[in-house]
Amino acid sequence: MAKHGKRYQESRKKVDREKLYSPADALELVKDIASANFDETVDLAVKLGVDPKHADQNVRGAVVLPKGTGKEVKVIVFAKGEKAKEAEEAGADVVGADDLAEKIKGGWLDFDVAIATPDMMSVVGKLGRILGPKGLMPNPKVGTVTFELEKAVKDAKAGKIEYRVDKNGNIHLPIGKVSFPVDDLMENFKTIIDVLLRERPASAKGRYMRSVTVSSTMGPGIKVDPNQAIDLIRK
């Protein structure tokens, strides 16, 4: 077990580990106990009642957070001709084709999102071993393999994030920074809960949203009442 520092231990004392907090109270507490000397990310962890070994229960997709992530997102685009121009005008940081692929093969990975037009996938596919393990491979399921580059680039810049359930049924997502007002964190929180509820697989049995936890980068987890999280959407 890793030992936590003094700040973490002090923060942990302020959290009732037996209590299920309301979403608003949990987010207030995350902000209150954040003590690092940088703007910590606020993370949301949701455990779903799914078995990812079954393809139809592999919950996956992408969502645009209405208040953004608070992070500057570097976007690269694989495209040629008019589509390359469209990507540049939409605000992509780097646009290229074979030259960009060679740059990545050489070890350059200074970006957060990679987007490609479908006709470029013969080039991008060869980067699978590099981009795949880092979660950077363009994928049509999350809208990063597309001819609609203006929308894809602007969504990525605005705070579009991908999610995918892990082998234990957990999904981890950033919902902003501790510097965000609670109302902004709540709006992002609600958006993700809403998306996950809509994505419930028809074959999932029993309770779907089993646990919800929020935390800051350096802080302890704060348990949220899943029923209250769901009620935010059903009101």
From Swiss-Prot:
Molecular-function GO term, any one: tRNA binding
General function of this protein: Binds directly to 23S rRNA. The L1 stalk is quite mobile in the ribosome, and is involved in E site tRNA release.
Example of a GO biological process term: regulation of translation
SUBUNIT field: Part of the 50S ribosomal subunit.
Gene: rplA
The keyword rRNA-binding appears for this protein: yes
Annotated keywords: Repressor, Ribonucleoprotein, Ribosomal protein, RNA-binding, rRNA-binding, Translation regulation, tRNA-binding
Family recorded in the similarity comment: Belongs to the universal ribosomal protein uL1 family.
Name of the molecule in the record: Large ribosomal subunit protein uL1
NCBIfam families from the UniProt entry: rplA_bact
GO cellular component, one term: large ribosomal subunit
Pfam families: Ribosomal_L1
